């Protein structure tokens, strides 16, 4: 069978447009832009994190065919993991507090995830949904996404979000009225755009 011109769902994560926020721009006298992350397949910026976490786990060998991905989440990271993990053939188990809406739980299941609800508990409590996910991963040998401490989460933005914003705004950065703002905003991003760059001698 020939190669299809269509791609899997993960190919459509990112490359979201910048939208001018007209009223805020007029109120402040600045050009204020919003990155339309709701246009990702799962409807949020967390699709980038999910794709980055899964891709890094595959590259490291921790995530292999037939593996289970588990995460404790009450937010959109679970949706991203369900969407991308299921598309790549993994079992995805989301541990979620029982005070979340039935609609969110239904959506997770519709996207292919299994859902375990647990009573709400403080973050550091052993019964907290994130701690339950960690414990089950250790006991069962599953892959814990660990979004809060997983550097692949942040690196997903270094490798995708930052270059996108740079490309989408570079045409404006040459203008005199934009140059200083662009310099301040992009100083920390330079490590991604030009990985060999050193940090500035002093903060801007």
What are the language-model segments listed below?
Residues 1-204:
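PLP-dependent amino-acid enzyme catalytic core
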């Amino acid at each position: 069978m020939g190669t299809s011109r269509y791609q899997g769902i993960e190919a459509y994560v990112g490359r979201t447009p910048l939208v001018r926020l007209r009223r805020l721009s007029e109120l402040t006298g600045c050009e204020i832009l919003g990155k339309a992350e709701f246009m990702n397949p799962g409807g949020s910026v967390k699709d980038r994190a999910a794709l980055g976490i899964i891709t890094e786990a595959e590259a490291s060998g921790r995530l292999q065919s037939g593996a289970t991905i588990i995460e404790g989440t009450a937010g959109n990271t679970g949706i991203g993991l369900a969407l991308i993990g299921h598309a790549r053939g993994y079992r995805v188990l989301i541990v979620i507090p029982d005070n979340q809406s039935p609609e969110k739980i239904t959506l997770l299941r519709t996207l292919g995830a299994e859902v375990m609800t647990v009573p709400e508990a403080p973050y550091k409590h052993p019964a907290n949904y994130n701690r339950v996910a960690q414990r089950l991963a250790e006991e069962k040998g599953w892959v814990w996404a660990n979004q809060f401490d997983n550097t692949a989460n942040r690196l997903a933005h270094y490798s995708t979000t930052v270059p996108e914003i740079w490309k989408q705004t570079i045409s404006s950065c040459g203008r005199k009225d934009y140059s200083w703002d662009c310099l301040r905003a992009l100083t920390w991003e330079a490590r991604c755009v030009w990985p060999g760059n050193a940090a500035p001698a002093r903060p801007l």
